[in-house]
């Protein structure tokens, strides 16, 4: 009964949300506004926007007139003709009117804050700036019913009576887009900005330059776009080969200005990023004298980090960058200019005569301090022109430039260090804010860079680390979602990866920490998904899928299938297909046993009102199924899946994800023993092996099988030699089947790590990874 009550509660929550309501944990009604406002108090009745309603503004400013026009544009979608816009007379608001008022209101302390009051007779939206009015309008628009554009005109639009007091928690609320790896049309960039502004996101971080392409026209240096904007090919998968397809493009200065102006109209600041000193190969290919070796260089056709960077000992590099930044500042009025600063190998600097001379002349300790010199020099130039720098957290290395803002991506540690030093920080750790990561089981997702960042995980992010004092915490400006595009080629794919996780992060950035509630957020998100449908946004429904996994029951000593959802109380339905056919649809109530090779399909009940997302997983039942192996070597803690049982849980690892099912061994062999519990006639043994050189993962040098009757004395029973250990394709999986045809109780399997990355590999000489997964044993029984 308890589970049924939870399911009923969720259904009521969703149905309320579909009517514009959701329930907070305190039981007070709140409408489907994202981000959740600071305060929402409901009243009785509704205001009807209808022909005859007037929009009033308290001044004749162009800004307020444009904001009134924004409201009219939305009402047209409801079939309501544009309402007349007039200036408020005698400071009295008549009935049947909507007032947009900007003034020095004492009760509104934030420039982005607003107070929205809806009664049966009037709507009043007050703020101290046009920006506050704009954000108040976004909340007002989300109070309106979801209406398909012009398909059924309404005689009126009803808004529930309420009072909202609202302002942001953080001043910086960002979204990022990498156009260096893959580029996207101007119209899509505008759509991206539209979606940001809907959810009160106020900074667009535009990553414009990379090793793989320079994307902004610089008129003084035309080769940057004539040469640097194009590459001869792109990688296949994770650097598994070239596609031999010429790729490139760039934004003209006119297009960039157009985007800046468009964003400004939606109160979004555009922050350009010009990478330095690393990720500069496209610039070096255009002007080889800017590198330490002088070239020749080409725009890079692989993903990753390249050793060739701007030469810090070459005075011409600084002249070049100052010229570039001068044109950039002319296009972008942003207070902040992002200069990158990340992933800059010191390989070339350490042997470059000019760089070493610079270190000597400036009395620097090493190449890390040389990077600090580089960044500080660029900062001084930008400061002189009234701008400030933002850099990735590597700019901490060797000493932080005096006024730099740090963007902390390698966890939160860099941000903590910078805040303790008195520097402003934008939190964007990969664990929660990298929206190019997988958001659900990789087997059912588009190919991605890796990682595993669910919607719920993004929503759980707290930008202010507990270790910071109150004073230090004030330096946390907010958080940002990053979309890197190595494996994202189309606008639709960008939308799929960014949404709805960007919406979750928007609430993290805006709403009070104490008001965040996952179940309530989901209720409001359902309504917003319908709004995204109307805007043709290809958002992901993965958060509404079901995780199909296996769990070892210590009491029964058996493996059982477990179905989980991130949505509390949601009813899960499933079917099982095995040798006997497909079962009827069942309601999941508890973990269940699997007794044959099976395919499990699971989804959330449509009675919940949630989007349909079917999850599917094959379970490879075999004679090793559920037997905990004994491991003689320890896997690396970074790739431990579910521990030893991961090797015999019936779930095969996916080549696209390194986290969920694989055990990773760094420089070590995978050495394990399986006890079948009694002597059996073993026909064959199979083990899963991953080959992914781009991530320093290689096939083993050999796989050896030994058998024993007593667990003490072992005899060789077969194996695979290196000459036949080749996956079907680069970056693929080999499920090796080793013929045995012998009786035994104990099976000893050793996959021998090659030791170090081979000659010619970027990691040459470093420890190699060995990844192993499912062990299948067939006894013919």
Residue ranges and their predicted role:
Residues 1-29:
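Bacterial Sec-dependent N-terminal signal peptides
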Residues 22, 44, 56, 512, ...:
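Short, compositionally stereotyped local motifs that mark structural "simplifiers"
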Residues 23-170, 493, 509-535:
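Contiguous, structured surface segment used for ligand recognition
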Residues 107-336, 377, 381, 480-484:
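Feature activates predominantly on carbohydrate-active enzymes
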Residues 129, 604-608, 753-755:
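Surface-exposed loop/turn motifs at beta-strand-loop junctions within extracellular Ig-like
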Residues 301, 305-402, 409-417:
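Active-site neighborhood of glycoside hydrolase catalytic domains
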Residues 389-394, 399-404, 410-560:
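Flexible, acidic glycine-rich loops studded with aromatic residues
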Residues 654-718, 730-781:
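Aromatic, loop-rich ligand-recognition surfaces of beta-strand-rich domains
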């Amino acid at each position: 009964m308890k589970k049924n009550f939870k399911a009923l509660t969720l259904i009521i929550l969703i149905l309320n949300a579909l009517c514009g309501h959701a329930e907070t944990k305190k039981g007070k009604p709140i409408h489907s506004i994202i981000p959740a406002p600071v305060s929402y108090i409901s009243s009785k009745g509704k205001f009807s926007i209808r022909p005859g309603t007037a929009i009033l503004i308290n001044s004749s400013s162009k800004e307020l007139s444009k904001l009134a026009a924004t409201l009219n544009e939305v009402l047209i979608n409801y079939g309501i003709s544009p309402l007349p816009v007039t200036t408020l007379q005698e400071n009295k608001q008549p009935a049947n009117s909507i007032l947009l008022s900007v003034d020095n209101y004492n009760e509104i302390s934030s420039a982005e804050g607003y107070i929205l009051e809806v009664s049966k007779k009037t709507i009043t939206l007050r703020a101290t700036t046009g920006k506050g009015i704009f954000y108040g309008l976004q909340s007002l628009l989300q109070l309106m019913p979801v209406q398909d554009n012009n398909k059924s005109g309404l005689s009126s639009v009803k808004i529930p009576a309420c009072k909202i007091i609202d302002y942001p928690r953080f001043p910086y609320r960002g979204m990022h887009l990498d156009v260096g790896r893959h580029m996207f049309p101007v119209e899509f960039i505008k759509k991206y900005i539209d979606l940001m502004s809907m959810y009160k996101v106020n900074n667009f971080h535009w990553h414009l330059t990379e090793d793989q392409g320079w994307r902004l026209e610089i008129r003084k240096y035309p080769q940057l776009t004539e040469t640097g904007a194009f590459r001869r090919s792109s990688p296949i998968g994770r650097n598994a080969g070239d596609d031999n397809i010429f790729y490139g493009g760039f934004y003209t200065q006119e297009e960039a200005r157009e985007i800046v102006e468009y964003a400004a109209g939606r109160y979004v600041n555009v922050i350009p990023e010009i990478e330095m000193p690393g990720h500069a190969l496209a610039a070096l290919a255009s002007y080889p004298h800017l590198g330490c070796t002088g070239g020749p260089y080409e725009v890079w056709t692989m993903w990753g980090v390249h050793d060739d960077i701007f030469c810090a000992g070459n005075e011409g590099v600084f002249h070049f960058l100052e010229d570039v930044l001068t044109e950039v500042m002319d296009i972008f009025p942003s207070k902040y200019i992002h200069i990158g600063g990340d992933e800059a190998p010191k390989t070339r600097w350490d042997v470059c005569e000019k760089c070493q001379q610079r270190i000597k002349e400036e009395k620097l300790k090493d190449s890390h301090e040389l990077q600090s010199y580089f960044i500080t020099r660029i900062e001084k130039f930008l400061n002189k022109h009234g701008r400030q720098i933002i850099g990735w957290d590597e700019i901490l290395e060797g000493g932080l430039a005096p006024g730099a803002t740090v963007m902390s991506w390698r966890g939160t540690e860099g941000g903590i260090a910078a805040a303790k030093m008195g520097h402003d920080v934008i939190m964007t750790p990969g664990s929660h804010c990298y929206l190019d990561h997988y958001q659900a089981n990789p087997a059912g997702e588009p190919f991605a860079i890796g990682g595993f960042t669910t919607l719920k995980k993004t929503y759980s992010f707290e930008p202010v680390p507990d270790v910071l004092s109150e004073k230090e915490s004030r330096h946390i400006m907010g958080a940002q979602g990053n979309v890197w595009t190595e494996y994202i080629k189309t606008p639709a794919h960008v939308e799929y990866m960014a949404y709805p996780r960007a919406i979750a992060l928007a609430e993290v950035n805006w709403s009070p920490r104490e008001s965040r509630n996952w179940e309530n957020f989901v209720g409001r998100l359902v309504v917003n998904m319908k709004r995204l449908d109307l805007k043709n946004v290809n958002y992901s429904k993965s958060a509404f899928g079901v995780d199909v996994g296996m769990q070892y029951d210590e009491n029964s000593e058996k493996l059982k299938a477990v179905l989980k959802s991130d949505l509390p109380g949601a009813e899960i339905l499933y079917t099982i297909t095995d040798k006997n056919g497909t079962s009827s649809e069942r309601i999941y109530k508890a973990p269940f046993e699997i007794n044959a090779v099976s395919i499990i399909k699971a989804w959330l009940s449509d009675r919940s009102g949630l989007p349909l997302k079917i999850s599917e997983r094959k379970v490879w039942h075999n004679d090793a199924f559920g037997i905990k192996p004994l491991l003689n070597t320890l896997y690396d803690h970074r790739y431990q899946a579910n521990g030893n049982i991961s090797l015999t849980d019936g779930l095969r690892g996916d080549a696209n994800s390194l986290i969920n099912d694989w055990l990773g061994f760094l420089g070590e062999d995978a050495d394990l023993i399986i006890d079948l519990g009694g002597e059996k006639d073993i026909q064959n043994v199979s083990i899963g092996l991953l080959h992914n050189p781009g991530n320093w993962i290689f096939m083993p040098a050999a796989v050896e099988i030994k058998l024993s009757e007593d667990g003490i004395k072992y005899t060789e029973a077969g194996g695979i030699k290196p000459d036949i250990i080749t996956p079907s394709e680069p970056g693929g999986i080999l499920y090796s089947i080793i013929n045995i045809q012998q009786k035994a109780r104990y099976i000893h399997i050793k996959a021998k790590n090659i030791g170090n990355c081979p000659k010619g590999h970027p990691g040459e000489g470093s420890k190699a990874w060995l990844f192993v997964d499912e062990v299948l044993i067939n006894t013919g029984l």
